[in-house]
Design a protein with these regions (language model features):
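Bacterial N-terminal signal peptides that target proteins for export
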Residues: 1-6
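Bacterial N-terminal signal peptides
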Residues: 7-15
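A residue-level marker of the well-folded mature domains of exported/periplasmic proteins
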Residues: 19-212
Length: 212
């Protein structure tokens, strides 16, 4: 995600910190993410910008095999005295307890990249995922008019996944209904697992006699 989008987060943080002579806030960042290379890079961008603004940052990465849950990570960050929690949830549907605890402790919550639905979110920074899906689907159908298509929809617990998929299918679905395109794979990938995605795609290709 471009640095200019990350800068939106710090505009919010500056508002939270108040006037120039007010103490700078401590920021907690909780990544409940998979194996994508983007996350360590974005962690670096956030920490670099926070340092430039004189802010203290504590970051937690929470993957599927972590001994602690993301909720535990967030509770510990909140209890450490942060002013703002930047939350990239693994499962946006299970973030309500985190939001409630943050509100109780008067900690502002910024939902980043993955939308969290709830009245206790103070700010969301991300893209219009549905429109991105529309662009992907349109580009695909401009280049491919017929044949076999495999779609991996991402993690079903990420609100971005169905939005991206639904946007893309606006252009793809008519070709499927006409029989021009045949869907040989159309499944979610739990936890955005790279290994699982490889296995699913390999199995689909083999079952379809390597025709894709």
């Amino acid at each position: 995600m471009p640095k200019r989008l990350l800068c939106c987060i710090f505009l919010v943080l500056m508002c939270v910190s108040g006037c120039d002579d007010a103490p700078k806030p401590k920021i907690g960042i909780s990544f409940g993410v998979g194996e994508a290379k983007r996350w360590p890079a974005e962690k670096g961008y956030m920490e670099e910008r926070a340092q430039e603004l004189g802010m203290e940052v504590e970051t937690r990465f929470n993957k599927a095999d972590a001994p602690k849950t993301q909720m535990q990570d967030c509770f510990e960050l909140i209890d450490s005295g942060i002013s703002v929690l930047i939350l990239i949830p693994r499962d946006a549907r299970k973030a309500n307890e985190i939001l409630a605890y943050a509100k109780k402790k008067n900690v502002k919550v910024i939902s980043y990249a993955r939308a969290v639905m709830g009245e206790d979110i103070d700010f969301f920074v991300g893209y219009d995922t549905y429109r991105i899906g529309q662009s992907l689907g349109l580009h695909l159908t401009e280049k491919t008019y017929k044949g076999n298509l495999a779609i991996l929809k991402g993690d079903k617990n990420d609100f971005n996944s169905p939005l991206l998929y639904d946007g893309a299918m606006i252009s793809i679905r008519p070709l499927v209904e006409r029989g021009a395109i045949h869907m040989i794979l159309d499944e979610y990938v739990n936890g955005w697992s790279v290994d699982l995605a490889k296995r699913m795609l390999t199995d689909a290709i083999i079952k379809n006699d390597y025709k894709i």
